[in-house]
């Protein structure tokens, strides 16, 4: 492992030299690529340098212990050696986790899509609950959210919602939410008290910069139409909603949340880029990144990742067998305990693979 870290340090030094060369400075894309690689290496290199410093201090302390005759001083040196050995062991473990393969999208903001699945109106209410939960979670993280498109009604039933979550590390946390979520509860309109089961699907796509993916504009059909949402006379007079159809893949993106046609168009293209990148990545590496269609699935009860059981006040994450209670608290956006457990499980599995 130390040899790998030494190579990281060498590459880090090379990048610092390269990034200052005139021919590199004039290439914006190359500068961006090198800066990202440098940022990815920085924590590893800082840990490795700290490890080397402590290892040298430990060696010096051991040499001092061999030559020191005064017992009081020897006792102090032994204490220092003990502390250094513990610190080195802890740091070695941290470096081991730091060397695990990282998802290159972890630092990115995201586009999240929630769709009601089986279960009629109850599925729409559950999709609304999930949407509110993620908005509250983003608020707790000081991330900003912005709706791109929403298909719902005044009763709080959401058939589909697409929105941005903007903040560093949003993908690293919320990527664990993609999949089919199931709810079991008694609807308010159910007189007999019978428990209903409904589903909603969640897709999480890292946001993609324009320079990361090229879209042939000749392959995109742009339709402009009147918004179906609230908006007063402006909606009646001016068509501002945008529908993009990417003809080679059949992907369709709608955006009608903004009053400005240009803003809706920009948002729609942001979603299209994210979806196209997801499809591209899925072809390159099926193991690392599921395609968007695989994420969304068919919202069927059989392919659930998590169940919210209201009568028993219990959440079960079926991927790792995690059980948590206090659903009202969780739905208020307090997801960190669940996400931390999923992230730790993923790191542990990756570590096994490294062995």
Curated annotation (Swiss-Prot):
Source superkingdom: Bacteria
Keywords, alphabetical: Cytoplasm, Methylation, Protein biosynthesis
One Gene Ontology term, aspect cellular component: cytoplasm
Keyword Cytoplasm: yes
Primary subcellular site in the record, as a coarse category: cytoplasm
Coiled-coil region(s): none
Location in the cell: Cytoplasm
Entry-linked Gene3D superfamilies: 3.30.160.20, 3.30.70.1660, 6.10.140.1950
InterPro entries attached to this UniProt entry: PCRF, Pep_chain_release_fac_I, Pep_chain_release_fac_I_sf, Prokaryotic/Mito_RF, RF-1
PTM: Methylated by PrmC. Methylation increases the termination efficiency of RF1.
Modified residues (N5-methylglutamine): 233
A molecular function (GO) term: translation release factor activity, codon specific
Protein family per UniProt: Belongs to the prokaryotic/mitochondrial release factor family.
HAMAP family: Rel_fac_1 (MF_00093)
Main function: Peptide chain release factor 1 directs the termination of translation in response to the peptide chain termination codons UAG and UAA.
PANTHER family for the chain: LD18447P
Name used for this protein in its record: Peptide chain release factor 1
């Amino acid at each position: 492992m130390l040899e790998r870290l030494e190579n990281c340090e060498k590459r880090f030094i090379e990048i610092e030299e390269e990034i200052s060369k005139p021919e590199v400075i004039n290439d914006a894309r190359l500068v961006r690529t090198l800066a990202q690689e440098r940022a990815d290496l920085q924590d590893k290199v800082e840990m490795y340098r700290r490890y080397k410093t402590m290892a040298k201090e430990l060696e010096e302390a051991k040499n001092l212990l061999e030559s020191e005759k005064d017992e009081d001083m020897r006792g102090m040196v032994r204490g220092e050696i003990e502390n250094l050995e513990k610190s080195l062991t802890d740091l070695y473990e941290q470096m081991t986790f730091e060397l695990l393969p990282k998802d290159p999208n972890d630092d990115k903001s995201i586009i999240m899509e929630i769709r009601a699945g089986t279960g009629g109106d109850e599925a729409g209410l559950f999709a609304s609950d999930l949407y509110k939960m993620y908005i509250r979670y983003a608020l707790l993280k000081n991330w900003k959210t912005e709706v791109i498109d929403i298909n719902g009604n005044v009763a709080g039933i959401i058939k589909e919602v697409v929105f941005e979550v903007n903040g560093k590390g949003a993908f690293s946390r919320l990527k664990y939410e993609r999949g089919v979520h199931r709810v079991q509860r008694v609807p308010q309109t159910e007189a007999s008290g019978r428990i209903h089961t409904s589903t909603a699907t969640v897709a999480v796509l890292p946001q993609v910069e324009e320079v990361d993916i090229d879209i042939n504009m000749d392959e995109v059909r742009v339709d402009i139409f009147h918004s179906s949402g609230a908006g007063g006379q402006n909606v009646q007079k001016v068509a501002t909603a945008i529908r993009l159809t990417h003809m080679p893949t059949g992907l369709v993106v709608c955006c009608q949340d903004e009053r400005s046609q240009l803003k809706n168009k920009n948002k729609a293209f942001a979603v299209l880029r994210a979806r196209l990148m997801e499809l591209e990545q899925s072809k390159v590496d099926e193991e690392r990144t599921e395609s968007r269609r695989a994420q969304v699935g068919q919202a069927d009860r059989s392919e659930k990742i998590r169940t919210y059981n209201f009568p028993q006040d219990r959440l079960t994450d079926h991927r790792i067998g995690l059980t948590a209670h206090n659903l009202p608290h969780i739905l208020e956006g307090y997801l960190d305990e669940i996400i931390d457990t999923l992230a730790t499980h993923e790191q542990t599995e990756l570590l096994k693979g490294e062995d």
